[in-house]
Regions:
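Flexible, substrate/cofactor-facing loop regions flanked by secondary structure
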Residues: 21-23, 37, 46-52
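Active-site nucleophilic cysteine motif
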Residues: 12, 24-43
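Second-shell loop/turn segments in exported
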Residues: 19-27, 83
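Aromatic- and glycine-rich peptidoglycan recognition patches
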Residues: 88-157
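Generic hydrophobic alpha-helical scaffold/packing signal
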Residues: 37, 74-77, 133
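Extracytoplasmic/periplasmic, Sec-exported soluble proteins
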Residues: 4, 27-31, 65-68
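Boundary regions of SH3-family modules and the immediately adjacent low-complexity/disordered segments
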Residues: 1-11, 15-18, 109, 144, ...
Length: 157
């Protein structure tokens, strides 16, 4: 499979309806970070396992209110906002689809919206949205994000 945004999003759509399974990383069940990791691995992209680790690879994007600076395929992260000198707490991740929509695993894999007028509006996750991460330009250029060809765990023996 190609390592481009449209191909990755197409793969994510094939996961819709798969049940939530804590620590799951297969078509039998996934958690939020397992969905992201599995979709990307199907495109030969290896990223860290947990959302709290995935949040700190690539380029952090502070999301504007109109989402104009977020691109399809960016990862969107959720959790506890930073306060009193404490760093934010990452607890959830999804893949941004454009038009204020994102795909994620919570209950099952489905599409939610940040837009209050949409039928699939997700007030809970909108309220805990933290930032986005752009990762594709950084594959094989940054530690923790590479292809199997550049990962020592996948080199031929």
């Amino acid at each position: 499979l190609k390592q481009d945004v449209e191909s990755i999003i197409e793969t994510a759509y094939t996961m819709i309806g798969i049940p939530y399974l804590w620590a799951g990383t297969s078509s039998k069940g996934v958690d939020c970070s397992g969905l992201v990791r599995t979709v990307l691995f199907m495109h030969d992209i290896i990223i860290p396992r947990d959302a709290s680790q995935q949040a700190y690879v690539g380029e952090r994007i502070e999301i504007t209110s109109d989402f104009a600076n977020v691109q399809r395929g960016d990862l969107v992260f959720f959790g506890r906002k930073a306060f009193s000198g404490r760093k934010e707490g990452i607890s959830h991740v999804g893949i941004y689809l454009g038009n204020k929509q994102f795909i994620h695993a919570l209950g099952d894999v489905h599409i939610s919206s940040f837009e209050p007028a949409d039928k699939n509006y997700d007030e809970f996750n909108t309220g805990r949205l933290l930032f986005a991460v752009r990762f594709l330009p950084y594959i094989n250029k940054e530690k923790g994000m590479n292809t199997t060809e550049h990962n020592p765990h996948y080199l031929p023996q």
